[in-house]
Amino acid sequence: MLSYQHAYHAGNFADVQKHLTLFAVADYLLRKKSAITYVDSHAGRGLYPLATKETQRLQEYREGIAPLWQARQQLSDPLLSRWLTALNSAQPNADVLSHYPGSPWWLAKALRDHDQLRLFELHPGEHEHLSGQTLPKQARRVYGDGLQGLKQLVPVATPRMCVLVDPSYERKAEYQEVVDAVAYTLEKVRHAVLMIWYPLLPARHHETLLSGLEASGIRKIWHSELLLRAAGESVHGMYGSGMVVINPPWGLDEQLAAAMSQVTPLLGSDSHYRAKWLVGE
């Protein structure tokens, strides 16, 4: 039963971490001319008006993008400034934060004429919303399971590949399914850059994902976590957000650390960021 709809959480602190990482990775990949196939395994709607009933119900963007937006003129980090400038281009009225773009929007923004984009979405309502979005001709929406679709897609025709895997993890089995899909993808496309988002919840199921990746034989696995509050202070709900990057671009860790040093003070006194290599070369 598919129940997760990201509109309830659009623009939250996890989106900030996920999309800032995605933006930094794509920015690096675009330095080379060779074509890229981008894949988003769980695309969602693509664009989220913040005034909708769903988003207003929880208003999680108030602990995410909103404080960054309000302070954007004072933020000096180059990566963060470029990201917020790009975010401004998603607004119908410049300098007024009314919409938050999901990963399909960020990926579509990186597309060049010779690149490709595959957007998978299994939730029928979310896919219907996604189908209504205006996207470049190189973007193809696929109504189906993103992890299965990813395995069927590889190997790709382009020299390079960049994948975002961000399930809702409504089922515990998804943590291991992600490990399996990622390992299969890297067997077919060895130098693919893969980004995997995961939630930090009191049940700590994300440890299944991290230990599975560590035991998989995959090399060059880096991960970072953005915590809104300490784990012990959350008896329920997400207290933090994690991103795994496999085959990360050179300098990504330093870039994100510098950006996050300006992000965390805006998210509250308990907010902090940490990162390390899970598996080296």
PLM features: residue spans?
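Class I S-adenosyl-L-methionine-dependent methyltransferase catalytic core
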Residues: M1-E281
